[in-house]
């Protein structure tokens, strides 16, 4: 649970920004979005495997030598 103590004479916008930053740092929003709807275990495995393949190809693309530009 995220608790933000509002300091004296602190504007609401500043407190809200601090709250958003701490929630983002804790990863609560991403977890909330992931748990919003039930995902079948097979669908979850399929999504994670597709993400791993995408990361793999992205890593390979970064290691490739650039084509000669002449």
UniProtKB/Swiss-Prot annotation:
A GO biological process held by the record: translation
Name of the protein this chain belongs to: Small ribosomal subunit protein bS21B
Membrane-crossing segments per the record: none
Entry annotated with the keyword Ribosomal protein: yes
A Gene Ontology term for the protein's cellular component: ribosome
Source organism, top-level taxon: Bacteria
InterPro entries registered for this protein in UniProt: Ribosomal_bS21, Ribosomal_bS21_sf
HAMAP family recorded: Ribosomal_bS21 (MF_00358)
Keyword rRNA-binding on entry: no
Keyword tags: Ribonucleoprotein, Ribosomal protein
One family name in Pfam for this protein: Ribosomal_S21
Family named by the database record: Belongs to the bacterial ribosomal protein bS21 family.
Source organism phylogeny: Bacteria, Pseudomonadati, Pseudomonadota, Betaproteobacteria, Burkholderiales
UniProt GO molecular function: structural constituent of ribosome
